[in-house]
Amino acid sequence: MRILGLDLGKKTIGVAVSDPLGFTAQGITTIRRANKEKDMEELRKICDEYKVETIVIGLPKNMNGTIGPSGEIAMEMGKLVEEALNIKVEFWDERLTTVAAHKAMLEADLSRSKRKKIVDKVASTYILQGYLDRISK
């Protein structure tokens, strides 16, 4: 059982996948967004390669817990992904995942250009790992 984690951005989609047992998340790629059809094609390839059964999408929430415009866009994308790929989609609160990703990369002493290239992939790993930790309890 593999689970895919997605961090949706305007220009890129960070992608992480669980190990086969669903204990750990590993960042695997960052998809450069083009259009809905090409984005779905890229996701389909990844889902087929890893035999994904569930997709977890980071849901941006305001600090007070409400869902704003970015959250609504993520929910629309989730519906599109579920229909296009016929794979169950769940959402995970992604508040502060990008902040945590930046902090971890700074502590690892990565250059600014390197951080910029992988921040979405790292954030998707945080999203997926949070979800995996919850379902394993």
UniProtKB/Swiss-Prot annotation:
What does the UniProt keyword field contain?
Cytoplasm, Hydrolase, Nuclease, Ribosome biogenesis
Q: Which InterPro entries match?
A: RNaseH-like_sf, YqgF, YqgF/RNaseH-like_dom, YqgF/RNaseH-like_dom_sf
Asked if Nuclease is a keyword of the record, the answer is: yes
| E.C. numbers | 3.1.-.-
Q: Which Pfam families match?
A: RuvX
The cross-references to SMART domains, in alphabetical order and at most eight, read: YqgFc
Principal subcellular localisation of the protein: cytoplasm
Which cellular components does GO assign to this protein?
cytosol
Cystine bridges: which residues?
none
Q: Which GO terms describe its molecular function?
A: nuclease activity
Where does it reside?
Cytoplasm
Q: Name one GO biological process term.
A: rRNA 5'-end processing
Which top-level group of life is the source organism from? Bacteria
Segments crossing the lipid bilayer: none
Q: Could you tell me what this protein does?
A: Could be a nuclease involved in processing of the 5'-end of pre-16S rRNA.
Q: Which family does it belong to?
A: Belongs to the YqgF nuclease family.
Q: Which PANTHER family match?
A: POLYNUCLEOTIDYL TRANSFERASE, RIBONUCLEASE H-LIKE SUPERFAMILY PROTEIN
Q: What is this protein called?
A: Putative pre-16S rRNA nuclease
Task: Provide the species name.
Answer: Clostridium botulinum (strain Eklund 17B / Type B)
